[in-house]
Amino acid sequence: MAGLNDVPFIKGLAVPSVCALIIFLGYASQFLFNYSTTLEPGPPTRRETIIFNGLLLVLWITYYRTVATDPGRYIFKDRVIEAEGQRWCNKCAAPKPPRAHHCRHCARCVPRMDHHCPWTRNCVSMTTFPHFLRFLIYTNMSLWMLGYFLWQRFSKIWEHRRLPAYLGPSFYGLICLSLISIVNFVTTVALGIMLINTVKSWVFNQTMIEGWEQERHEALMDKGPKEWWDIMGPDGEKVRFERLEFPYDIGFFSNMAQAMGTHNVLLWFFPFAGNPTVAKDGNGQGWTWEENGFNRIEGLWPPPDPDKLRRAARGWPAGNRNYAEELRQANMSSSEYKAGFLKRQADDEKRKRHLMAELEEVDDFDMYDDEEYDRELDQGLGWVNSDGDRLRDYGVDEEASEPEGVNDDDDDDDDDDVPLAELIRRRKILKKDGLDD
């Protein structure tokens, strides 16, 4: 499901496709039941029709609210250049509160991001989760009722299976009934699984992303220190790895009430009920989250990612740029720049020929293990869980995140690793703030 977010064709047709599916299963089926004179036991009763269409109406309302509700955004009162001791988003150039992740589709940090749903073209987040849950509940109820109608008609066909064919349903009526049944069965199974996973997330107060993080953390702890013994932090000290408990499971009822934004159980399933919103003052709902106190201190989640820490230790490639040389080239004339480019190109060709000559001297060069290469390439894309999902598959922009401590300004020499454009941006902000004062 998550990979569908990257298919442009599906992204554009996702919502219209869902609407077409609702129309086909909800209304084409009723047309068949009411106007096919050969299908027993005949049209649904008045009571059944009212209940079924009532469920369809609620389904439309909850789906619209799931699609149209803003997934939430963080608004900072003051301009922030750096945030010591907090997670930092490189794309938003702002601190990243707990449980927030930068969605590569919504292009923002989303509060309590669960995943980016391709069928709603929206993030399932702190603000949209109640509508998403209600949509799944009423959709499954509608599918179950439609399944009951279909079972009634197929049971009659089976009951009269020994009668002559002309006494049974028409050929086209049987084809339509079978097609609706197949689509209904597939949709019921898919959305039933989705409902189970969503209710599990609701009860345990754990998003899909946090479940992925916990599975990765447990796998890392099971492997032992051999997986992280070589990892050093930005301060040159070894990073401390310890087994962490998921901190946001604060109790059955509290988990559910927090996700729905109210302790009133009746409003949890009311289609017109509201949703939680992000506090405007930079503190409170959406900014801070209650923890269960099972870990030695608060704020340890998410657990450190060894892969990100290793990448941070290697440094950003732009940090190795020769800014003095770039400034010198900026003052060159077009002819001088072209001559320099041609010289570098010739040097590259010379190095390439030298490398190929060395490779030709290796006797077993053609015996390179392609499968091993594929495994290394796959591992380079990041850790995958038991379902084969990476963090990117949930819509998270991993490039927007940095390991904790990467942005700490413990030493004046840290500016040497900051890109030139970032230093210029900070200087402009400081100058502007000075003029405002």
From Swiss-Prot:
Subcellular location: Endoplasmic reticulum membrane
Residue ranges crossing the lipid bilayer per the database entry: 13-33, 49-69, 131-151, 174-194
Stretches assigned to the DHHC domain: 87-137
Keyword terms of this UniProt record: Acyltransferase, Endoplasmic reticulum, Lipoprotein, Membrane, Palmitate, Transferase, Transmembrane, Transmembrane helix
Membrane topology: Multi-pass membrane protein
Catalysed conversion reaction: L-cysteinyl-[protein] + hexadecanoyl-CoA = S-hexadecanoyl-L-cysteinyl-[protein] + CoA
Catalytic residue positions: C117
Cross-referenced PROSITE patterns: DHHC
A GO molecular-function annotation: protein-cysteine S-palmitoyltransferase activity
Lumenal face of the membrane: 34-48, 152-173
Residue ranges with Acidic residues bias: 396-419
Cytoplasmic topological domain residue ranges: 1-12, 70-130, 195-437
InterPro entries: Palmitoyltrfase_DHHC, PFA4, PFA4/ZDH16/20/ERF2-like
Pfam families tied to this protein: DHHC (PF01529)
Any single Gene Ontology cellular-component annotation: endoplasmic reticulum membrane
EC number: 2.3.1.225
Chain spans, region Disordered: 377-419
Swiss-Prot/TrEMBL domain comment: The DHHC domain is required for palmitoyltransferase activity.
Role this protein plays: Mediates the reversible addition of palmitate to target proteins, thereby regulating their membrane association and biological function.
Family to which the UniProt record says this protein belongs: Belongs to the DHHC palmitoyltransferase family. PFA4 subfamily.
Xref: PANTHER family: PALMITOYLTRANSFERASE ZDHHC16 (PTHR12246)
Protein name, entry field: Palmitoyltransferase PFA4
Species this protein is from: Gibberella zeae (strain ATCC MYA-4620 / CBS 123657 / FGSC 9075 / NRRL 31084 / PH-1) (Wheat head blight fungus)
Gene, per the UniProt record: PFA4
